[in-house]
């Protein structure tokens, strides 16, 4: 805890409000609300926490707070601040999570369409449906039963669907408002589960067609009846009152929360929404924050009723969700909340089971790799790769895997300092010596296994540095790629030989991940360095353009091409004088002409 935080903690009020934790860049990384700001904010910096909260606290270098009149006001403010700042440690709802609806347009000649966007007073909406496939299947069925207009053709033209009996040509069929009102009422009854009359009508038409020996038409009516029956069976009846409602349940364990929402429409469960996320403060408060964000998303239909668990404050929910909030006390409705809660518990347990299974698989892979190489279990693996283009901007990178997982805080980047031209062996020698001479000198944690990207030559160079130059006893292995640039062989031993490794084994998958990761990290770093070098060389020797202004241009425009495309005004907007801007543009033009001249 730094001195600034210590001083601010002493000044915190005993009031409700919101607090905003910031990192060293001044970026808001977490927004929370509290009934008592002093108690809540101080709790982050006192006592012990679980791992994820410790990670959050380790990044906090400053905080701000906003005092509110009430807990309700604090909740509303918190939701708005999260939506505005999108802090990385706050609950994040699934991106672009919207559900399809069926819509009857309010045009003079209505159409039946599928949409994910609800607009007020823009038609009748039915749904939501769990996915596009389900919505399309229902629409196809409705299209075959109800002859809505299918296209935007002028009303004096007959479309293709008219000939299929699925569209009412408006110059031929009824055009009076009463006809369309009856048709819309039929669709509403059908989608509300009152389809007995429609089935009876279809059955009568099927029998009549059979008597007339029109068996193809009779088969069509039979298929329609079958389609309605199938749609019925796919929707589980959850209540007899045919009410539209959302049912919330949540469960917390091991610092994680799972929220389940059942979407019940006309008494039938049509879909559920599942979200799992870590929580850092109070479970009930994080649940309220989730609900606020959930319904702030305009694509989430707000039903007539929302059921919430017993532990949640009804008044706070009512302040953020504009509908009837119910906390069921007994009977079927309470059982529905219990069912949502049970499903939340099951989903959370599944997550933990999968994590445990993954840990066991990874642990087994590390154990097996150690046995295969006849070394101690390689709990910590450090892997290296070089990257350059014909010797220009040469760099290297090191990635670290601990217990089979990337430890990104331990990753390191190296600019090659002593090697001229494209020499992978010399570059590898320099980087390994720099890394492990420091490990030896400073007593840093040494790996159980070093992996270099390359064949026999790279491995021999690495062993020479580690064993002969530095006198260390760290096992060294090499990973060779095939002609498709894919992980192929593991080299190890004295003398070096290919270690037999089944391609479908967990050990092979682990090594493949390590090689891909170190390659990605090295190439990304090389691109950054090359871009910066290209940027700097082009902008060298321009009067008035020092290192700070170069860095400003690099951060804003990224490339010389982007600067060349920018207007003088755009560059001046960064605080660079007009005369310097003109010099920059002239330099870029001169360089371009030099490259194009023979």
Curated annotation (Swiss-Prot):
According to the entry, every stretch annotated as the GIY-YIG domain falls at: 14-91
Q: Which GO terms describe its cellular component?
A: cytoplasm; excinuclease repair complex
Q: Entry's Pfam families?
A: GIY-YIG, HHH_5, UVR, UvrC_RNaseH, UvrC_RNaseH_dom
| Domain of life (superkingdom) | Bacteria
The protein's UniProt keywords, in alphabetical order, are:
Cytoplasm, DNA damage, DNA excision, DNA repair, Excision nuclease, SOS response
Task: Please list which residues make up the signal peptide.
Answer: none
Which GO terms of the molecular function aspect are on file? Answer: DNA binding; excinuclease ABC activity
**Where does it reside?**
Cytoplasm
Q: What is this protein called?
A: UvrABC system protein C
From what organism does this protein derive? Streptococcus pyogenes serotype M1
Q: Which gene encodes it?
A: uvrC
């Amino acid at each position: 805890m730094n001195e600034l935080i210590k001083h601010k903690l002493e000044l915190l009020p005993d009031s409700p409000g919101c607090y905003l934790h910031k990192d060293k860049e001044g970026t808001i990384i977490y927004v929370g609300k509290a009934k008592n700001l002093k108690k809540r904010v101080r709790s982050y910096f006192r006592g012990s926490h679980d791992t994820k909260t410790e990670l959050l606290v380790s990044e906090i270098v400053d905080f701000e707070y906003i005092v509110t009149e009430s807990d309700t006001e604090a909740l509303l403010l918190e939701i708005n601040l999260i939506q505005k700042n999108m802090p990385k440690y706050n609950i994040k709802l699934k991106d672009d999570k919207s559900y399809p609806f069926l819509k009857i347009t309010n045009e003079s000649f209505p159409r039946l369409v599928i949409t994910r966007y609800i607009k007020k007073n823009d038609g009748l909406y039915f749904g939501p449906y769990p996915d596009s496939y389900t919505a399309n299947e229902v629409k196809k069925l409705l299209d075959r039963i109800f002859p809505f207009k299918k296209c935007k053709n002028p009303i004096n033209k007959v479309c293709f669907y008219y000939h299929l009996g699925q569209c009412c040509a408006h110059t031929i069929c009824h055009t009076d408002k009463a006809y369309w009102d009856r048709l819309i009422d039929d669709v509403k009854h059908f989608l509300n589960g009152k389809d007995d009359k429609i089935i009876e009508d279809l059955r009568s038409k099927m029998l009549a067609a059979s008597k007339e020996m029109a068996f193809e038409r009779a088969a069509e009516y039979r298929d329609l009846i079958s389609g309605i029956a199938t749609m019925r069976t796919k929707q589980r009846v959850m209540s007899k009152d045919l009410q539209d409602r959302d049912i919330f349940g949540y469960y917390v364990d091991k610092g994680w929360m799972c929220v389940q929402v059942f979407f019940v429409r006309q008494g039938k469960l049509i879909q559920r929404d599942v979200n799992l996320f870590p929580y850092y403060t109070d479970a009930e408060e994080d649940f309220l924050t989730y609900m606020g964000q959930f319904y702030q998303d305009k694509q989430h239909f707000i039903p007539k009723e929302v059921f919430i668990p017993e532990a949640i404050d009804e008044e706070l929910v009512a302040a953020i969700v504009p509908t009837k909030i119910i906390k069921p006390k007994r009977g079927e409705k309470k059982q529905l909340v219990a069912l949502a809660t049970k499903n939340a518990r099951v989903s959370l347990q599944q997550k933990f089971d999968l994590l445990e299974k993954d840990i066991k698989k990874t642990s087994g892979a590390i154990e097996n790799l150690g046995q295969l190489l006849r070394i101690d279990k390689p709990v910590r693996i450090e892997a290296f790769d070089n990257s350059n283009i014909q010797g220009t901007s040469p760099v290297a990178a090191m990635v670290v895997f601990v217990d089979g997982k990337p430890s990104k805080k331990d990753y390191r980047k190296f600019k090659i300092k002593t090697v001229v031209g494209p020499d992978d062996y010399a570059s590898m020698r320099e980087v390994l010596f720099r890394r492990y001479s420091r490990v030896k000198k400073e007593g840093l944690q040494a790996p159980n296994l070093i992996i270099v990207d390359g064949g026999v030559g790279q491995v021999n160079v690495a062993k020479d540095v580690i064993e002969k130059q530095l006198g260390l006893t760290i096992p060294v292995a090499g990973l060779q790629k095939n002609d498709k640039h894919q992980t192929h062989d593991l080299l190890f031993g004295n003398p070096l030989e290919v270690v037999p490794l089944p391609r479908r084994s967990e050990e092979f998958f682990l090594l493949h991940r390590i090689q891909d990761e170190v390659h990605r990290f090295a190439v990304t770093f090389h691109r950054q360095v090359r871009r910066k070098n290209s940027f700097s060389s082009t902008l060298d020797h321009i009067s008035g353009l020092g290192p700070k202004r170069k860095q400003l241009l690099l951060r804003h425009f990224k490339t010389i091409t982007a600067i060349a495309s920018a207007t003088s005004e755009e560059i001046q907007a960064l605080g660079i004088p007009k005369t310097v801007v003109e010099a920059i543009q002239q330099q870029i033009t001169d360089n371009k002409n030099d490259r194009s001249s023979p």
